[in-house]
């Protein structure tokens, strides 16, 4: 067996070179339809495994996924073969490290700060939620995914980004095309063609909005970045807005749909959540149970040992937070939705320098505003046919319909 010397954390070791096993059976379609049985098997049999169809080495245990995301010196966000670059037509802050990443992230941080959310955005969010709920017909069966989850997320995002001129339909379409492109690990040309169309439409709108936001500064992310004392380049401002559109619709939309499904299929838990008014707890459990962003990739900067296997420099590892959130070492019966499980931190918002900047917005809009208002309006809402709810997604996942009866 071949041997080589590998330097890890300034210690030089000598050992046989064992590469991770290869899974050449699992397909992207398998992962899109239902990845959870696959991840459960991987955690037990091969927690470090190279999945040939995705061309990446999967890490499925919580310790490993957090370790990778917390250590950008060894695991870079700059995945050279990521479909995110063609999907967004940019090298976005999601694929940058160090000072470059920090500068672009901080450029819009003020718009997402907890004080700005509480003082400025929360009252707007409440008005939006009430306006959209006013449209719902009591007593009817309604697809909340189509009528509420997506549109409310889009309208809230339009305000905080400063793109209110875009319709809900446009923002939802752009977001879906961006994330379909970013998760296009099969490199299907038609998905990039659709994201190209979305980029062209967004660029046209953004060009029209630059003058408005420069002449009338406001708390939106667009205006905040444009009017900063040392602004980042306009191309990166556009890229930041696109990243926010990509994640800012699907994350709260899919989180809300997942939480509603979990509560409505566990009525005893729902009643206890209502009694305790612990909507924030329900929010966190929903994100743990089905992470809206299921996986993240990192470029390995130096030969590294993980669980006895060499992950070589230049390899791309994929941290599967969807699997980490159900890891038996962290969560008892992690496959089940249980609002009242013992507290353990999930990884749905990431970890380390790339921790999701919109985490507090999502907690506020979904956990603190939408859930209590929705169940106050429709306290006896039911999901009459849970088996009709469909779930999709490998990189990004959630229900794609949610037919409930409003009572």
From Swiss-Prot:
<dbReference type="GO" id="GO:0020037">
    <property type="term" value="F:heme binding"/>
</dbReference>
<protein>
    <recommendedName>
        <fullName>Cytochrome P450-pinF2, plant-inducible</fullName>
        <ecNumber>1.14.-.-</ecNumber>
    </recommendedName>
</protein>
<keyword id="KW-0560">Oxidoreductase</keyword>
<keyword id="KW-0408">Iron</keyword>
<dbReference type="InterPro" id="IPR017972">
    <property type="entry name" value="Cyt_P450_CS"/>
</dbReference>
<dbReference type="InterPro" id="IPR001128">
    <property type="entry name" value="Cyt_P450"/>
</dbReference>
<dbReference type="InterPro" id="IPR036396">
    <property type="entry name" value="Cyt_P450_sf"/>
</dbReference>
<keyword id="KW-0503">Monooxygenase</keyword>
<dbReference type="GO" id="GO:0004497">
    <property type="term" value="F:monooxygenase activity"/>
</dbReference>
<keyword id="KW-0479">Metal-binding</keyword>
<keyword id="KW-0614">Plasmid</keyword>
<comment type="function">
    <text>Not essential for virulence, but may be involved in the detoxification of plant protective agents at the site of wounding.</text>
</comment>
<feature type="binding site" description="axial binding residue">
    <location>
        <position position="356"/>
    </location>
    <ligand>
        <name>heme</name>
    </ligand>
</feature>
<dbReference type="Pfam" id="PF00067">
    <property type="entry name" value="p450"/>
</dbReference>
<dbReference type="GO" id="GO:0005506">
    <property type="term" value="F:iron ion binding"/>
</dbReference>
<dbReference type="GO" id="GO:0016705">
    <property type="term" value="F:oxidoreductase activity, acting on paired donors, with incorporation or reduction of molecular oxygen"/>
</dbReference>
<comment type="similarity">
    <text>Belongs to the cytochrome P450 family.</text>
</comment>
<dbReference type="InterPro" id="IPR002397">
    <property type="entry name" value="Cyt_P450_B"/>
</dbReference>
<keyword id="KW-0349">Heme</keyword>
